[in-house]
Amino acid sequence: MQFTSFAILAISAVASARVTRRDDSSATGADKGGTCAVGSQISCCTTNSSGSDILGNVLGGSCLLDNVSLISSLNSNCPAGNTFCCPSNQDGTLNINVSCIPVSA
């Protein structure tokens, strides 16, 4: 009986252990939220200069690559429908003439 009580107490202690959040401020691609593929970054296209379609946001808009994460897009820091996974160079700049994939939240 005592062993069962101890086992139940130990299992509940392990199950209720608090998980610490890792700092992903320097993570990119698949490391940042597990949403984008390796070599891609989450970007937020905040303006639309060539119509109301998605390509207008990516090709003609202002896409921010820094300080954008899936969590910020879900917290309405990035307007709905304007969060994309865009391929990036090793220096973190956005590649020209490549397709960005919309992230659906």
UniProtKB/Swiss-Prot annotation:
Q: What happens when the gene is disrupted?
A: Leads to the repression of hcf-4 and induction of hcf-2 and hcf-3. Decreases the hydrophobicity of the cell surface. Leads to very few rodlets, which are found in dispersed patches. Does not affect the ability of the fungus to grow in vitro on agar plates or in liquid culture. Does neither affect mycelium growth and sporulation, nor the frequency and speed of conidium germination.
Q: Does the keyword Glycoprotein apply?
A: yes
Question: Does Cell division appear among the keywords?
Answer: no
Q: In which tissues is it expressed?
A: Abundant on conidia and aerial structures formed in vitro and emerging from disease lesions on infected tomato plants.
Disulphide linkage map:
C36-C85, C44-C78, C45-C63, C86-C100
In which domain of life is the source organism classified? Eukaryota
Q: What induces it?
A: Expression is increased during sporulation. Expression up-regulated by carbon or nitrogen starvation.
Q: Which UniProt keywords apply?
A: Cell wall, Disulfide bond, Glycoprotein, Secreted, Signal
Q: Report the subcellular localization.
A: Secreted; Secreted, Cell wall
Positions annotated with a glycan in the UniProt record: N48, N67, N97
**Which residues belong to the signal peptide in this entry?**
1-17
* Major location (coarse): secreted
The UniProt function text for this chain reads:
Aerial growth, conidiation, and dispersal of filamentous fungi in the environment rely upon a capability of their secreting small amphipathic proteins called hydrophobins (HPBs) with low sequence identity. Class I can self-assemble into an outermost layer of rodlet bundles on aerial cell surfaces, conferring cellular hydrophobicity that supports fungal growth, development and dispersal; whereas Class II form highly ordered films at water-air interfaces through intermolecular interactions but contribute nothing to the rodlet structure.
Similarity-based family: Belongs to the fungal hydrophobin family.
**Quaternary state and interactors:** Self-assembles to form functional amyloid fibrils called rodlets. Self-assembly into fibrillar rodlets occurs spontaneously at hydrophobic:hydrophilic interfaces and the rodlets further associate laterally to form amphipathic monolayers.
- Please state what the protein is called: Class I hydrophobin 1
**Which organism was this protein described from?**
Passalora fulva
